[in-house]
Each structure stands twice: as structure tokens, then as C-alpha cells.
Amino acid sequence: MAENHKLWGGRFEASLEKWVEEFGASISFDQKMAEFDLKGSIAHVTMLGETGIIAQEEALQIKQGLEELLEEYKAGKLEFDVSNEDIHMNIESLLTAKIGPVAGKLHTARSRNDQVATDMHLYLKAKLVEVIEKIDNLRNTLVSLADKHTYTIMPGYTHLQHAQPISFGHHLMAYYNMFTRDSERFEFNIKHTDISPLGAAALAGTTFPIDRNMTSDLMGFAKPYSNSLDAVSDRDFILEFLSNSSILMMHMTRICEEIINWCSNEFKFVTLSDTFSTGSSIMPQKKNPDMAELIRGKSGRVYGNLIGLLTVMKSLPLAYNKDLQEDKEGMFDTVETITVAIDILAGMLNTMTVNDKHMAESTEKDFSNATELADYLATKGLPFREAHEIVGKLVLECTKAGYYLQDVPLERYQEVSDLIEEDIYETLKSHTAVERRHSLGGTGFDQVKWQIKEAQQSLNK
């Protein structure tokens, strides 16, 4: 009978079949947490020495070995073995090879259950800071572009139909606000991630006189978990990250969809930089917005990662279960997906050319000024519903005749209502329509300038 050399092998008389071992191994992906596993172990062994649970000289020897492994990892020199299952056992094996049997004391008062939870908290906390920095760069890009295009007029849409003329800067600031809320959600996510599970052990804590506050402080956490079962068994901080990432991706797909439309021949509102476009293998003229399409497409994998972990966690009894091995790949994949996608979107926006003249002209070949005429009549005392009816009939008349509201003769306007005077033509201009919308948060130029100023002050804090 084959001898079992696993670190947990004392209980077993036979070894795992190789193909079964490969099925249960996680080192192929959880090695991404190697740096954080080493840092957590350094904090743990420091505490073991300080509290006298192990001798100080042993703690220092183990700590030095871990620090050497950390340097080797950063230099790309560590090699991991699938037979050691996961990152924790790989590092313990490497440490044993480096400093000998004393390495076995590292795991005193610790379980892989609190160890892996600690690794994930450390990993995600670091990545959340990175994600927020990238979102803030995207927000800066949007504010700069909005400031440049405060006075650029474009059609505002509902149902993808021309609705009312708006400032392009106003349109961009809408996305700025969405991404600001995304950033705030990730900030709040840090609060729920900035908690140390270390010391919870397998599920019930430990009989050793550990100092959880010390390890929490050494790792830079705000505090330790107050319940050991909760510490090792829940992954809501990851679910929160995946949920926040899904909302972020949804927002990015919306602006990407608009960019895809805007650079088409049907719109011609923007031209993407060659550095963010691709061509066709058969059609020489093509310049495709592939990066925007990829961001739109990659939303599916991020949504899938959220649903995947929700399904893993559904009905899972306390405390640790092997199901929780499935909590990592979706998290890693989402981190990698959104960090690149944010940078790609910011780069596209920063380098695209805006055809502001064509944007403005497109508002002159539609009926997006119809609300201006209805409001004009309402300000002169006509009930808005009557004004709406009158303007609707005029639009129908113009549509049949092949011209627009600004082309209607004054005589015809005055046949419709004696409230209409010559100033109607100034009112119907797109620039006037935008400029007059002074209500708080509206598209009026003064309001857009105010939004931009508020955003700049927020970003500079």
C-alpha cells in the first residue's frame, strides 16, 4: 500500500489516485495569492513568537525563510507542485526544504480554512484599491472630455430616436456620475474586506493564546472578525465585489454600445483612434470598434462569475466546505477583466475624435425642438396638454410636407395659435434649446459647467 506523504496524510492508509489529485488541486490558479499567503504567514509566525507560543528564535528562523521565499516569488523563481494541492501546502513544502523541520511549527494555531480566507481578503483588498484608482482615471477622462465639449450640441435620445438637443458634455457627465457611484461601491466593498479572518482556525478558534489583534494590525486590516464561523465560511465580500463589478461592466457596456453606434456611417459622431480599432481580413475598408465590442461581450463572463459564486454559496451549511474552492477563479478572472476593460475604455475616450459639427447639424434635421414649441405655448398661458396636441399635429403636417418646425412660415404658425410670434425661430434653435435648460442638473451650459466644477473638486480631494 502506497505511503501517504500529504501534510494531512496521518489519517489515511492509501494515497489519492493521480487523476483524482489533479481534480482536487487548486495550485494552478490559487498561486495568484502566493504573495499574500506569504505575508499572512509572516504576520502569523511573528505573533507566535511574540506570544511565546513558539520560541522566538524559531519564529525568527521561520520568518526569515518566508521573507526569502517572498523575494524569490517576486523575482519569478518559485516553482509550484500540483502534488502539494494548493498554494498553502506548496509554500509550507518550500519552506521545509529551505529551513528544515522547524517549518512545521508555522501552522501552529492555524488552519487552511482561516489561512485561505485571509489570503483572499488581502488579495481582494489590494485589487480593490487598484480598481478604484483605474475608475478614477476613467472619471478624470470623462470630465476632461466633457469640459472640452460643454458647448457641443448633439441629439439626446429616447428609444434611440431623437428626443431633445443636449450638450455632449452633459451626456458624458451622465457616465461620470455612474462611474462615481461604481467607485463608491468599491470603496464600501473595502470596508467589508478589510477584516482579518486569521486566528479563526478551522471553525471554532484555538486553545492557543493567540493575539488576533496583533496579526490583524501586522497585515494592515482594520479589525479581526468577531465570529470564527463567519470568518471561515462566508464569501460575501467576494460576492459584493462580483456584484459591483457586474454593475460597473453594465455601465461600461452602455457607453461602449454608444461608441459603436457613434462611429458608424449612420451616426458619424466620432472616429476612433487606429490604436483602438481593427480591420477585416477580407474587406479592406473596414475599421472596426473591436475593443468596445469586447468590453460589451466580456460583461457576460463577469455576470457569469457572480452567478457562479452565488450558486456555490446557496444553501451551503456552516462552516467550511470544499465547494469554497470554487470561490477563487471567478474572482481572479473578474479582477483581470475589469482592470483591463477600464483602461481600454479610458484610452478609447481619450483618443477618439469628436465630429462636433456633424453632431450639431444632426439636431437641425429632426423634430427634437418640438418640446421647445410646446413649452413656448405653455409659458404664454396655454395648458401644456393643448400645446402638446397642437405641436403634435404640426409635426405630422411637417412630416407629410417634408420640412421641419423651423421651416414653418410665421403666417402658418399664427393660424395655429395667435400666441406664436417671430421670436419662435430663435426658440427653436438647438443652441437656444440647450442653453435655456437651467434647471438643476439639466443640460444648460451653466449647469454642465457646474457639474464639471463639482466633479473636478471631488476628483482633486
From Swiss-Prot:
Q: Where in the cell is it found?
A: Cytoplasm
Q: Which GO terms describe its biological process?
A: arginine biosynthetic process via ornithine; L-arginine biosynthetic process
Pfam families, A to Z: ASL_C2 (PF14698), Lyase_1 (PF00206)
This enzyme catalyses:
2-(N(omega)-L-arginino)succinate = fumarate + L-arginine
Q: Which EC class, in a word?
A: lyase
One GO cellular component term: cytosol
Domain of life of the organism encoding this protein: Bacteria
The UniProt entry, under PANTHER family, shows: ARGININOSUCCINATE LYASE
Name of the molecule in the record:
Argininosuccinate lyase
